[in-house]
Structure formats: C-alpha cells, structure tokens
Amino acid sequence: MSESISVIREKLSHVISEQDAFFQLCLQDERKGVIKLIESTRKKLEKEAQLIAKLAEMKQYETNLSTQGFQYIAGVDEVGRGPLAGPVVAAAVILPADFSLLGINDSKQLSEAKRDMLFEIIKKEALSIGVGIIEHDMIDQVNIYEATKLAMSEALDQLNPAPDFILVDAMPLKYSESELSLIKGDTKSISIAAASIIAKVTRDRMMQHYDALYPGYDFANNMGYGTKKHLNGLDTIGVCPIHRLSFSPVKEAKLHFESLK
C-alpha cells in the first residue's frame, strides 16, 4: 500500500466494519504505524458495537410496550434522596419511538461533560419533559421517601401529552394503573435513563448555584452529600437555609450550635 500513515488514519476513521474493503487491505500492510492504527480502529469498532448492543437492550421495554399499542411511554427517575442539603429532583421523559442515542446510560455512570451533552440532546428531541422539585423543608415534613414520590408525581403532571404507560426506576409510584417499576431501571430503559440525566443535571446546577449563596460546604462538588468538606462545614459554620434538618448529622450540628447560644 502506497498511502501515507496520515492518509490511512483519515480513511480508517470512516470505517464502520472490519469487513470494510479498506480495513481488509490495511491488514496486509506490515508497517508498525499501520498495525497500530488497525489495533486502535478495531478497539473503536468493538466499543461502538457494545454501545449499539446496549442501546438495543435499553429499548426493549419501550419496543415491547409499543407493540402492545402504548404510544406515550414515560420514564421517571429521581436524584437527591441521600444528600444532607438541597432538594430531591425527579424528571419524567417521553421519547419518540425512533429515538436512539449511543452512550445513554444511568446518569451516575456518565461524566459531567457527557451528561451535559446528552441533556441538551434529550431536551431538544423528547416529546415531553417534566421536572418535579421538592425542597428541603418539605422533605423534613413528609420524609424523603414520600418527598420523592411527590417529585415524581409533579414531574408526570407536567407531561403533555400525558403518558399512557409509565416506567419508574426502583420504587412503585402508583401514579397510574399502566405502570412498571424496574430495579436499576436507569440501566435497563432508555426512557428512565433519559429522565435520570434530566434530573441529575437539573439538580447539579441548582447545587452549584447554592454553592455561591452558601459557601463553606463545597456544594458545587459534593451536591449536598455528606463528604468530609461538607461535614467540616457543618462543624465550623453550622447549618444553612437549604440543609435537611431531619437528617443526621445536620440535626446534631443544629443542636450543637443552638447549645452554644
């Protein structure tokens, strides 16, 4: 083969299968640079094949429901049950039947940059999106489990068109008779995964805003979870207006500072 390494690199970047004629031709090239390009291309194709297989797996519930006549299938997920501060946020998302997005997964398994990119794509292409936000004070009143259900219901109430079937991550919501709860649903359903991304990015941005309002707890990085910096902030500053007072160790920090007055 007479092409330079740079030309071969460019051509291999467009190859979509190892059966491609140019890929097969490159296999006969004994130059070390070409051998390395073949190896990297093979790894890229293997990764893409895995992503395609994962996407097909994550669309199985939606595909099966569509064949049963359901048209508007909503995925629902939440983020923020465990933090010591801030709201619990739920999202409900109805995707088009032909929606495909390689790399979509549980939001917690994605980098921030990847989540932000997918967030914008989902917002643009979804048929409908609802976001429910239950603040810290309501969490303290009703407990985090009930607050999560309220956030999910609030998100579903916003959907237009209304869903005719609901896929919920982990917890039975009892919002509709046509509903299915899936353990680890954000890794099994593309609709739930989309909802998890919307909820996660929405809440993370809220906590980054709160970090500027209430410095000293590192909210921009821990998102309200009980990290060492957050706990140090509680010990030295005390509680702030968005802390969940019913959660330990927030409750203890509040009592400690009250005892010093």
UniProtKB/Swiss-Prot annotation:
* Domain of life according to the entry: Bacteria
**PANTHER family xrefs:** RIBONUCLEASE H2 SUBUNIT A, RIBONUCLEASE HII
Reported function: Endonuclease that specifically degrades the RNA of RNA-DNA hybrids.
As cofactor, the record names: Mn(2+); Mg(2+)
What family does the database annotate? Answer: Belongs to the RNase HII family.
Catalytic reactions of this protein: Endonucleolytic cleavage to 5'-phosphomonoester
Tell me what gene encodes this.
Answer: rnhB
| Gene Ontology molecular functions | manganese ion binding; RNA binding; RNA-DNA hybrid ribonuclease activity
Q: Enumerate the residues binding a divalent metal cation.
A: D77, E78, D169
Name of the molecule in the record? Ribonuclease HII
EC code: 3.1.26.4
InterPro entries in the record: RNase_HII, RNase_HII/HIII, RNase_HII/HIII_dom, RNaseH-like_sf, RNaseH_sf
Keywords in alphabetical order, please: Cytoplasm, Endonuclease, Hydrolase, Manganese, Metal-binding, Nuclease
